[in-house]
């Protein structure tokens, strides 16, 4: 697993309080129980960790762990 993937999963686990193994295919809302506020906070945490800005229109498209990993890899 890449360093980015590990860091993204760590942030997801911390932000959403997930104790179990997080799969790359996991949906923030459907699988991990996030609500709209959780997803906003998650995006803010990713922006801070990776020192990047995720525009709202891009953030709306990031709904799974893998999409977050892919976005960070292509924008950092």
Curated annotation (Swiss-Prot):
4'-phosphopantetheine is transferred from CoA to a specific serine of apo-ACP by AcpS. This modification is essential for activity because fatty acids are bound in thioester linkage to the sulfhydryl of the prosthetic group. Residues 2-76 form the Carrier domain. Pfam families: PP-binding. Gene3D superfamilies: ACP-like (1.10.1200.10). Keywords: Cytoplasm, Fatty acid biosynthesis, Fatty acid metabolism, Lipid biosynthesis, Lipid metabolism, Phosphopantetheine, Phosphoprotein. This is Acyl carrier protein. It is found in: Cytoplasm. One of its GO terms (cellular component) is membrane. The modification O-(pantetheine 4'-phosphoryl)serine is found at residue 36. One of its GO terms (molecular function) is acyl binding. Carrier of the growing fatty acid chain in fatty acid biosynthesis. Its main location: cytoplasm. InterPro entries: ACP, ACP-like_sf, PP-bd_ACP, Ppantetheine_attach_site. One of its GO terms (biological process) is lipid A biosynthetic process. It comes from Methylococcus capsulatus (strain ATCC 33009 / NCIMB 11132 / Bath). Pathway: Lipid metabolism; fatty acid biosynthesis. Belongs to the acyl carrier protein (ACP) family.
């Amino acid at each position: 697993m890449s360093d980015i993937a590990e860091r993204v999963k760590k942030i997801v686990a911390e932000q959403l309080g997930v104790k179990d193994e997080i799969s790359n295919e996991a949906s923030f809302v459907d699988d991990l129980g996030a609500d709209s506020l959780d997803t906003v906070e998650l995006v803010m945490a990713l922006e801070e960790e990776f020192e990047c800005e995720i525009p709202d229109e891009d953030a709306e498209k990031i709904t799974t762990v893998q999409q977050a990993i892919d976005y960070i890899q292509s924008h950092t």
